[in-house]
Amino acid sequence: MDRLFRGGSQPRRSFLDRLVYAFDVEHAKRTSNFEHLYKQWYQLLKSGQTDNFWLTSLEEEMAGLGVAIAAARREQIAKLNTFIDHEPDDVFPNVKLELDGTVEKMLDNMPALDVEEAYAAKLKSQRRNVLYNDNVDGVNRTDFKVYYKKKRMPAELCSTGEQK
């Protein structure tokens, strides 16, 4: 776990999703379904499929699942931050947990249904990215960030001992 904050975002995202699974049994199903749809969508685009109806259908379903995934992650982060804020610093380090993701940021400012529509439109606009091997932004790219309040620095810049 001490290397969790030194590498890429995928292990942190998986770690967070496992925390969410513990409190929301449907989260595992949503993430699995999202990953399946994402792979299908990606493969269709890579193979040159241009069936707009099929792609749009996948994007809308991915957007619905993506918003639910982002909302569950946000809820878990909020609960953890509340718990951490109420614990003395000698029991648990004074840290701030955050999510760095497009969908999560949209949920800060818009109702979930509007975010779902915006996310589906974003997926549609990113179809070209797949063809050019660029990243596709969404809940599949969300990063789980930890900040050490005492030193006002991200966990990845803290010493290994501080990270533990």
Q: Residue locations for each model-derived region?
A:
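Amphipathic, alpha-helical segments enriched in basic
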Residues: 2-5, 9-16, 51-55, 59, ...
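Extended, charged alpha-helical "arm/stalk" segments used for dimerization and assembly
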Residues: 1-43
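Conserved NTPase motor "head" modules and their coupling/switch loops across ABC/AAA+ ATPases, GTPases
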Residues: 53-164
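Alpha-helical structural elements of signaling/regulatory helical domains
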Residues: 25-29, 50, 72-75
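Secondary-structure edge/capping motif, primarily at the C-terminal ends of alpha-helices
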Residues: 45-49
